[in-house]
Amino acid sequence: GSGLVGSEMCIRDSVTGMVDKDTPAVFITGVDITSMAVTDILIYRQEAGLVNVALDKNSGVSAAVYPYRQLSPQDIDGDGIIELPCPEADSAAEQTDGFVAWMSWKSDGRFEQSAKTYHCLSAGWYFTIPLSWWNWDVDALVTAISNENQMTLRINGDSVLSIYTITGENRDSRSRMGHRLVLRRQTTTVYAGEVFEIAPYYGMDEDLLRRSFNLILGTWNNS
């Protein structure tokens, strides 16, 4: 076991929500000195009172331990159940952008992956990775020019789609260049997307690109 003691843990947030469709829970996340997020999932059982369903019976601490990248447990896929973020571990702790697996825990302590996203906290958006891509070699290439960031998702080295974060005076005209389509407009930023020629082969089109793109809301609200 990791022998964590309370004093080494900095409690980041607590979130209330459902762990199964009929079981409310409190998700309390602490971050340890190695930048791992440790989440206790507390439910109330008539016979036992408060129970931590994420508890590892052997180590006596939570088994819900994932790299911390400033993301909170949340219902990422809209199914009414809270998922825990599990960012890809190979990025540095300061790096807030990257792929995230979202794990849903059951009240009996079982868990499974229920979503995958590319989260771009630096620009305030995320993209839901289609289920059919989960077993493929998907990577992200990020490039930046003046007033424009581009994130390209590639499968087996093929560029499938790009998402652009565009600022500056001529952002509207740049959001419509070539085959780009406008995804969202904010006060000073336009988010645009583009699907490339190979996209249909991987089941991606402009409609799915639109539906898979979301702005991150209330990220900074540490409730």
Regions found by a protein language model. Give the residues of each.
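Single conserved hydrophobic/aromatic residue that forms the stacking wall/gate
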Residues: 1-6, 10-13
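Surface-exposed amphipathic alpha-helical segments
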Residues: 133, 193-223
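Secretory pathway targeting signatures of secreted, lumenal, and periplasmic proteins
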Residues: 130-183
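Beta-propeller blade termini
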Residues: 12-20, 68-78
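Conserved blade-ending motifs and adjacent loop-strand segments that build the rim/top face
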Residues: 53-74
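Beta-propeller fold detector
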Residues: 7-8, 52-59, 113-118
